[in-house]
Regions:
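Absolute protein N-terminus
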Residues: 1-2
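Short, contiguous alpha-helical
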Residues: 5-20, 29-77, 122-173
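Helix-adjacent hinge/juxtasegments
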Residues: 65-111
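Acidic catalytic patch
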Residues: 107-124
Length: 173
């Protein structure tokens, strides 16, 4: 579980870094189609948030913490849905979700979670498949890194220095 705690902390730090850098971009730069899976930086950041809400819900067996401005739970209808229209709001919820993910990994370690426990995963076609907790956690952190890598590539193409992304150097920064 120590590895998953490390990944959760790394993701929290990288997400904070990416939102800080993206906060310097104008709306046009955030929303321009860049040819990645979800088109733009903004849509990619929303997609990562949706996936994290889903996985947090599955692993903790608790409702997703994502909510609207009135505090009502957000209904997630698709993996490319725009959850929040403003980057500041998305960033606020990103911080909350990242803290919850770190807390979730720490709780799993504390309770010596059974990594062979099966989780149900509903596919977009409605069918249900099962994965072990271990495989689900590996997928979850790989998914974040994969899509965040798309965003850092776009930033690099815009000649914006994102900074160090090496996990080994995380604690030095």
């Amino acid at each position: 579980m120590e590895a998953f705690i490390t990944f959760a902390r790394y993701n929290r730090q990288m997400n904070a870094q990416i939102y800080d850098v993206c906060g310097q971009l104008d709306q046009g730069q955030l929303e321009a189609d860049r040819g990645v899976f979800f088109g733009s930086i903004y849509r990619t950041l929303n997609h990562i948030m949706i996936a994290d809400g889903y996985w947090l819900q599955r692993v903790t067996r608790q409702p997703s913490p994502l909510a609207d401005s009135a505090g009502e739970p957000l209904a997630i209808r698709s993996v490319d849905q725009i959850l929040y229209q403003e980057l500041a709001t998305l960033s606020h919820w990103r911080s909350i979700i990242d803290d919850r993910i770190v807390g979730c990994m720490e709780a799993l370690a504390q309770e010596s979670a059974d990594l062979s426990r099966l989780l149900d995963h509903r596919l977009m076609d409605g069918s249900v498949v099962q994965f072990t907790l271990h495989k689900a956690l590996c997928h979850w952190f790989n998914h974040q890194t994969h899509h965040r890598g798309q965003v850092t590539t776009i930033l690099s193409q815009l000649h914006i220095d994102f900074g160090v992304t090496d996990l080994l150097l995380m604690e030095l920064n």
